[in-house]
């Protein structure tokens, strides 16, 4: 199913709004949707390759593996990560990647204090092999409370380096998957969720409730419905409701439509005020569509949706308001 965020982006790109592309290059790059010369990319539903600038399937489609080579050689890790998630062959990334000299980093013999770990991170955060060392030390450290804030503040760099490590050493986190989920949770503003739901600044990470929560929030980030259902904590109804409500709130403010729908179908609730507040912060009509989806039977209604059918069948989006001037849907 196409992401509605991508659909909304395509709707804007079809206006050929050059100023929009220049203004929001950072957003597009962050999503891994920005290629050379501000070209917006999307996966072609027919051939599986890449359609530039929201075009339909045809001669303009770019080979996905060729574009992966381009991304890796130019250190565009977010683009490479996006292409890998769309089915690009990782062998092409391996052939053209820069070598990582220390995939098995030399770990300090003694356990470092939080202060020493933060100093290590500040000194070597921009080095691939040292970054792996930091993750390994952090994973084994018992005193992690003071370290979380550092990684949270370095959120922009963290996502870039995570994508780099994913491209270069895809199986590195195989033995410590739930720690990897914790890193992702901290990166994506979920530190607030952990604090809000468990009512502690840093919860006990070996607690089953917290582990399920972290995995659930990580599944929210990836919009993986099956993971969300598997990791959904069912032992306590209050925690259950908080998880779902915060999952909807987080999905609303981050444009994660499938996560929003899944939390809704599992019993989450959100007010119209939340819809409106989230929509005011978003540029691309995401929450208006979410508001509509939250009030209909969910059975994958957006499988082949595109901006043209949205406009042509706008009466189906009632009670949403459609603006002929802006071509947007509003609450």
Swiss-Prot record:
The protein, known as: Protein MGF 300-4L
Family: Belongs to the asfivirus MGF 300 family.
Extra facts: Encoded by variable regions comprise the left 35-kb and the right 15-kb ends of the viral genome. Transcribed in host macrophages.
Origin: domain of life: Viruses
């Amino acid at each position: 199913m196409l992401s509605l965020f991508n659909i909304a982006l395509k709707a804007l790109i079809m206006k050929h709004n050059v100023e929009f592309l220049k203004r929001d290059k950072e957003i597009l790059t962050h999503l891994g949707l920005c290629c050379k010369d501000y070209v917006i990319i999307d996966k072609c539903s027919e051939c599986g390759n890449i359609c530039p600038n929201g075009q339909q399937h045809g001669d303009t489609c770019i080979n996905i593996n060729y574009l992966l080579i381009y991304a890796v050689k130019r250190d565009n890790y977010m683009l490479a990560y996006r292409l890998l998630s769309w089915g690009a062959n990782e062998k092409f990334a391996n052939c053209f990647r820069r070598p990582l000299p220390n995939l098995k980093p030399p770990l300090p013999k003694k356990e470092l204090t939080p202060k020493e770990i933060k100093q290590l991170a500040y000194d070597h955060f921009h080095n691939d092999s040292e970054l792996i060392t930091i993750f390994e030390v952090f994973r084994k450290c018992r005193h992690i409370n003071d370290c979380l804030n550092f990684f949270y503040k370095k959120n922009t760099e963290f996502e870039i380096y995570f994508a780099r490590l994913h491209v270069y050493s895809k199986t590195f986190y195989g033995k410590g998957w739930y720690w990897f989920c914790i890193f992702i949770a901290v990166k994506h503003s979920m530190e607030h969720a952990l604090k809000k739901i468990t009512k502690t600044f840093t919860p006990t990470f070996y607690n089953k409730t917290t582990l399920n929560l972290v995995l659930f929030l990580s599944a929210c980030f990836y919009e993986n419905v099956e993971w969300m259902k598997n990791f959904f904590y069912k032992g306590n109804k209050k925690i259950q409701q908080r998880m779902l409500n915060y999952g909807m709130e987080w999905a609303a403010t981050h444009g994660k439509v499938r996560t929003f729908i899944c939390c809704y179908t599992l019993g989450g609730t959100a007010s119209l005020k939340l819809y409106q507040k989230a929509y005011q912060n978003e540029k691309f009509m995401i929450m208006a569509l979410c508001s509509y989806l939250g009030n209909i039977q969910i059975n994958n209604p957006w499988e082949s949706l595109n901006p043209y059918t949205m406009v042509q069948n706008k009466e189906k989006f009632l009670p949403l308001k459609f603006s002929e001037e802006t071509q947007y849907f509003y609450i």
